[in-house]
A protein has these predicted regions:
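A short beta-sheet element
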Residues: 22-26, 39-113
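Generic structural signal for secondary-structure transition and capping sites
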Residues: 2-6, 117, 164
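Amphipathic alpha-helical segments
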Residues: 108, 142-167
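Short beta-strand/loop turn elements enriched in aromatics
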Residues: 15-36
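A generic structural signal for alpha-helix starts
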Residues: 103, 116, 147-150
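Short, recurring structural edge motifs at helix starts
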Residues: 46-49, 128-130, 139-149, 165
Protein backbone atom coordinates (compact mmCIF):
# COMPACT_ATOMS: atom_id res chain seq x y z
CA UNK A 1 0.00 0.00 0.00
CA UNK A 2 1.07 3.52 -0.71
CA UNK A 3 0.59 6.84 1.04
CA UNK A 4 0.23 10.14 -0.80
CA UNK A 5 2.50 13.15 -0.34
CA UNK A 6 -0.10 15.91 -0.22
CA UNK A 7 0.61 18.74 2.22
CA UNK A 8 -2.12 20.51 4.21
CA UNK A 9 -2.10 23.23 1.54
CA UNK A 10 -3.14 20.63 -1.06
CA UNK A 11 -6.18 19.63 1.01
CA UNK A 12 -9.53 21.24 1.74
CA UNK A 13 -11.43 21.27 5.03
CA UNK A 14 -14.75 21.67 3.24
CA UNK A 15 -15.09 19.84 -0.07
CA UNK A 16 -13.28 17.26 -2.12
CA UNK A 17 -13.53 13.87 -3.74
CA UNK A 18 -11.72 11.74 -1.15
CA UNK A 19 -10.78 11.88 2.52
CA UNK A 20 -7.16 12.04 3.63
CA UNK A 21 -5.58 10.81 6.88
CA UNK A 22 -2.78 13.25 7.75
CA UNK A 23 0.06 12.24 10.09
CA UNK A 24 -0.45 15.28 12.33
CA UNK A 25 -4.03 14.20 12.95
CA UNK A 26 -2.93 10.64 13.73
CA UNK A 27 -0.43 12.00 16.26
CA UNK A 28 -2.72 14.50 17.98
CA UNK A 29 -6.38 14.31 16.98
CA UNK A 30 -7.30 10.69 16.32
CA UNK A 31 -7.42 7.85 18.80
CA UNK A 32 -6.46 4.22 18.48
CA UNK A 33 -9.50 3.58 16.28
CA UNK A 34 -10.46 6.20 13.70
CA UNK A 35 -14.17 6.04 12.89
CA UNK A 36 -14.14 7.86 9.55
CA UNK A 37 -17.93 8.24 9.63
CA UNK A 38 -17.68 10.41 12.78
CA UNK A 39 -14.47 12.39 12.27
CA UNK A 40 -14.04 15.27 9.87
CA UNK A 41 -11.07 14.48 7.66
CA UNK A 42 -9.29 16.84 5.26
CA UNK A 43 -10.40 16.35 1.67
CA UNK A 44 -8.39 15.75 -1.50
CA UNK A 45 -9.42 18.19 -4.23
CA UNK A 46 -7.57 16.80 -7.27
CA UNK A 47 -9.34 13.92 -9.01
CA UNK A 48 -6.13 12.81 -10.78
CA UNK A 49 -4.75 11.78 -7.40
CA UNK A 50 -7.37 9.03 -7.09
CA UNK A 51 -6.19 7.17 -10.18
CA UNK A 52 -2.61 7.09 -8.90
CA UNK A 53 -3.60 5.63 -5.51
CA UNK A 54 -6.57 3.44 -6.48
CA UNK A 55 -4.87 0.28 -5.18
CA UNK A 56 -4.30 2.01 -1.83
CA UNK A 57 -7.86 3.05 -0.97
CA UNK A 58 -8.24 2.30 2.72
CA UNK A 59 -10.57 -0.34 4.11
CA UNK A 60 -11.96 -1.05 7.56
CA UNK A 61 -9.24 -2.73 9.62
CA UNK A 62 -6.34 -1.02 7.84
CA UNK A 63 -3.84 0.71 10.11
CA UNK A 64 -2.24 4.11 9.46
CA UNK A 65 1.06 4.72 11.26
CA UNK A 66 2.59 8.19 11.65
CA UNK A 67 6.20 7.73 10.52
CA UNK A 68 7.47 11.17 11.57
CA UNK A 69 7.24 13.32 14.72
CA UNK A 70 9.31 15.68 16.80
CA UNK A 71 9.55 13.13 19.60
CA UNK A 72 9.08 9.42 20.30
CA UNK A 73 5.38 9.51 19.41
CA UNK A 74 6.57 8.23 16.03
CA UNK A 75 4.70 5.01 15.38
CA UNK A 76 1.39 6.16 16.84
CA UNK A 77 -1.36 4.73 14.72
CA UNK A 78 -5.08 4.68 14.06
CA UNK A 79 -7.06 1.67 12.91
CA UNK A 80 -9.66 2.53 10.26
CA UNK A 81 -13.30 1.81 11.14
CA UNK A 82 -16.74 3.05 10.11
CA UNK A 83 -15.83 3.20 6.43
CA UNK A 84 -18.78 2.85 4.10
CA UNK A 85 -18.70 4.25 0.57
CA UNK A 86 -16.13 7.00 1.13
CA UNK A 87 -12.73 6.95 -0.50
CA UNK A 88 -10.03 7.45 2.13
CA UNK A 89 -6.28 7.65 1.51
CA UNK A 90 -3.27 7.56 3.79
CA UNK A 91 -1.49 10.91 3.69
CA UNK A 92 1.89 12.54 4.04
CA UNK A 93 4.31 10.98 6.57
CA UNK A 94 2.15 7.92 7.15
CA UNK A 95 2.62 4.23 6.51
CA UNK A 96 -0.59 2.36 5.63
CA UNK A 97 -0.87 -1.34 6.42
CA UNK A 98 -3.50 -3.89 5.54
CA UNK A 99 -3.42 -6.97 7.78
CA UNK A 100 -2.94 -10.27 6.00
CA UNK A 101 -4.97 -12.03 8.68
CA UNK A 102 -8.40 -11.10 10.02
CA UNK A 103 -8.44 -9.12 13.28
CA UNK A 104 -11.39 -8.02 15.40
CA UNK A 105 -12.22 -4.32 15.11
CA UNK A 106 -10.10 -2.26 17.47
CA UNK A 107 -7.61 -4.93 18.46
CA UNK A 108 -4.75 -3.77 16.22
CA UNK A 109 -5.34 -0.08 16.92
CA UNK A 110 -5.05 -0.58 20.66
CA UNK A 111 -2.26 -3.15 20.52
CA UNK A 112 -0.02 -1.20 18.13
CA UNK A 113 -0.32 1.86 20.39
CA UNK A 114 0.49 -0.12 23.54
CA UNK A 115 3.75 0.43 25.39
CA UNK A 116 4.55 -3.26 24.85
CA UNK A 117 4.62 -2.73 21.07
CA UNK A 118 6.02 0.83 21.14
CA UNK A 119 9.11 -0.35 23.06
CA UNK A 120 10.08 -2.27 19.90
CA UNK A 121 9.94 0.94 17.84
CA UNK A 122 12.20 3.13 19.99
CA UNK A 123 15.51 1.52 18.92
CA UNK A 124 14.35 1.64 15.27
CA UNK A 125 13.70 5.41 15.27
CA UNK A 126 16.14 7.71 13.50
CA UNK A 127 16.84 11.42 13.74
CA UNK A 128 17.60 14.07 16.31
CA UNK A 129 15.30 17.07 15.82
CA UNK A 130 12.73 15.20 13.76
CA UNK A 131 12.34 11.51 14.48
CA UNK A 132 11.15 8.98 11.92
CA UNK A 133 10.72 5.28 11.33
CA UNK A 134 10.85 3.48 7.99
CA UNK A 135 8.74 0.73 6.44
CA UNK A 136 11.77 -1.54 6.40
CA UNK A 137 12.43 -0.92 10.11
CA UNK A 138 8.80 -1.74 10.91
CA UNK A 139 9.38 -5.21 9.44
CA UNK A 140 11.68 -5.91 12.40
CA UNK A 141 8.77 -5.77 14.86
CA UNK A 142 6.62 -8.59 16.20
CA UNK A 143 2.87 -8.49 16.71
CA UNK A 144 1.67 -10.77 19.48
CA UNK A 145 -1.99 -11.71 19.32
CA UNK A 146 -4.50 -14.36 20.19
CA UNK A 147 -5.93 -16.24 17.21
CA UNK A 148 -9.41 -16.04 18.75
CA UNK A 149 -11.37 -13.25 17.05
CA UNK A 150 -13.82 -13.38 19.95
CA UNK A 151 -11.04 -12.71 22.47
CA UNK A 152 -9.57 -9.96 20.25
CA UNK A 153 -13.03 -8.38 20.11
CA UNK A 154 -13.35 -8.46 23.89
CA UNK A 155 -9.93 -6.83 24.27
CA UNK A 156 -10.77 -4.12 21.72
CA UNK A 157 -14.18 -3.48 23.33
CA UNK A 158 -12.61 -3.28 26.80
CA UNK A 159 -10.14 -0.59 25.75
CA UNK A 160 -12.82 1.26 23.82
CA UNK A 161 -14.98 1.25 26.97
CA UNK A 162 -12.09 2.69 28.98
CA UNK A 163 -11.53 5.37 26.30
CA UNK A 164 -15.19 6.41 26.56
CA UNK A 165 -14.98 6.56 30.37
CA UNK A 166 -11.96 8.85 30.16
CA UNK A 167 -13.38 11.16 27.50
Amino acid sequence: MQNNTLSRADLSNETGIAKNVHYGDVLIKFGDVLDVSREQLPMIKDEKILDKYKASFLQNGDVIIADTAEDTTVGKCSEIAGLRDEVVLSGLHTIPYRPVEKFATGYLGYYLNSSAFHKQLIPLMQGIKVTSISKSAMQDTDIIYTKSLEEQGKIGNFFQFIDHLIT
